[in-house]
Amino acid sequence: MKINFYNRNFLKLLIILNFIGIVAAFYTYIPDIKKQVAAESYFLIPFFMVSVWLYLLAFFGTFYLHSRREFPIFFGGLIFLFSFVYGLGSLLFYPLFMFFVYGFSLYHFWNIFAHGFVGFQSVLFFRHLKKQKFYSFAPLVFLFLFYDFLGIFYGGFLYFTDFSFPFFLKMFLIYH
């Protein structure tokens, strides 16, 4: 039996699951949003909500696939890269986080599957991207570097601000 991952009903299911992911991820960030508002660090709010962006971009990606539209060049690249890097990166990050820092928790164990689910959707997105010129990757690379810079040096990466990481693990996660 062959499974068609581009079946419109399957894509509708992915759209619904990604929407649930957006709402659930936003709900988990409410205490952190309140902290940033109290500290008057409003500019960091969009940058630390990695999970919300992950599900939101996957939602748009599956919507484009469902509606049989072509991905815009920059937006399609952003959807793919964000889903690939942060989705599949969670398959590495959360086990290391639980092993070296926090210990086992159902919440972080669940995040392996929830974020990894979006990472595997990036494979669906990849097949529908237009080929890009090399120079068109520069804005995407700059955006990711800026996003990670704010995350690491301005407290946007909440795991680094809320937990004490061993030095070698922090360096590995920053430079992987």
Language model: regions and residue ranges:
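Aromatic-rich, lipid-facing transmembrane alpha helices and their immediate juxtamembrane interface loops
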Residues: 1-176
